[in-house]
Design a protein with these regions (language model features):
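A feature for loop-to-transmembrane-helix boundaries and adjacent hydrophobic helices
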Residues: 1-349
Length: 349
């Protein structure tokens, strides 16, 4: 059952909130907090990506199409994954595609975002691994904000807890009384007791991960380093948090292993293995970031039937270089390339 309003209580803290799932109304159309939280997370991710793209050797104008494709198909993938986990609960195709009431699986969004975003990078000539690193940072911001949509919807919570921050509402009670609850064999659920606010756990986990990786950006050893560390960090947190939830697909009830935990475990193991391998491979080799060629110069080069011969020396910077230096050097580099293109065009004419 979906509640438009909820009295949400944290008995151990003496706190209670009257929540309305509707944030505001435009022309008779209700805009839900769930969508607002996702939109805020997306905006923060975009601000980060455009502000720091040059430090990864990515031209901000060139990545616009990549972002649009990655976001749209990522959301579609998130919904498709969610529906695939419980396809028989929907009575029509319209219910399957309706996301206003919630129902986006983060794993589907991550997989779709990276997959289709990577293909878009190839199409637009954007370096794939550096773009993945930017995307991983954006995911942490987006997920950290987006999880609060689950709070307003009163969904994606955990099993009973006696911890001070345990949460209770009519929505949690109604769900725990339903037949769709999934818990490990032998675990007893009491609908009248507080539950783990797992949305809060994951939100905090993502924001802490963003802070740690942000401090590591200048120390990264190879392209894709941030992405691998994201997989390990998020996978580890998701494995733990998923074990507390009551709404995920159970694979092995006897030990409480869920499908999402299996994916999280694979991400952690694969991420650690790849991180160790590439760290050893690039040991002692500082990461050099090519200066980003802007979209205007890329288009001009194509008209000249390929890249021009460029005699400039400052075409790369150490990844540890300050952001201000990346801005200055990239601007100067593109000015030199533009002048060289114009000169080459005059000779060709």
């Amino acid at each position: 059952m979906n509640y438009l309003t909820n009295l949400v209580q944290f008995p151990g803290l003496g706190l209670s909130f009257h929540l309305n799932r509707v944030a505001f109304t435009i022309g008779g159309v209700s805009i839900y907090w769930y969508g607002v939280c996702i939109a805020v997370g997306l905006c923060l991710a975009l601000v980060f990506a455009f502000r720091h793209s040059l430090e990864f050797g990515v031209d901000p104008d060139s990545m616009v199409d990549v972002i649009l494709i990655g976001v749209v198909l990522g959301i579609i993938s998130a919904r498709a994954y969610y529906v695939a986990m419980a396809p028989f609960k929907y009575e029509s195709i319209w219910e399957m595609i309706a996301i206003r009431d919630g129902g986006l699986a983060i794993y589907g969004g991550i997989i779709g975002g990276f997959l289709f975003g990577g293909l878009a990078c190839k199409w637009r000539g954007v370096p794939v691994l550096p773009m993945f690193d930017l995307t991983a940072m954006g995911f942490l911001l987006g997920q950290g904000c987006g999880r609060w949509g689950n709070f307003f919807n009163q969904e994606a919570f955990g099993c009973n807890t006696t911890l001070p921050w345990g949460m209770y509402s009519e929505a949690t009670r109604a769900y725990l009384m339903s037949s769709t609850v999934t818990v490990p064999k032998g675990v007893v659920i009491d609908p009248n007791l507080p539950v783990h606010p797992t949305f809060l756990y994951e939100s905090i986990w993502c924001f802490v991960g963003f802070f740690l990786l942000f401090r590591y950006i200048k120390k990264r050893k190879f392209n894709g380093d941030i992405t691998l560390r994201y997989l390990v960090w998020y996978g580890a947190g998701r494995f733990w948090i998923e074990g507390l939830r009551t709404d995920s697909l159970m694979l092995v009830p006897s030990i409480g292993l869920r499908a999402s935990q299996l994916l999280a475990g694979i991400a952690v193991v694969a991420g650690i293995a790849a991180e160790v391998y590439f760290t050893r491979k690039f040991k002692g080799k500082p990461l050099l970031v090519p200066l980003a060629l802007n979209a205007e110069n890329k288009a001009a080069q194509k008209k000249l039937d390929g890249p021009i011969a460029f005699a400039g020396k400052d075409t790369q910077l150490l990844a540890s270089s300050p952001r201000k230096l990346f801005l200055e050097k990239t601007e100067a580099y593109n000015a030199q390339v533009k002048a060289a293109i114009e000169q080459a065009g005059q000779k060709k004419a």
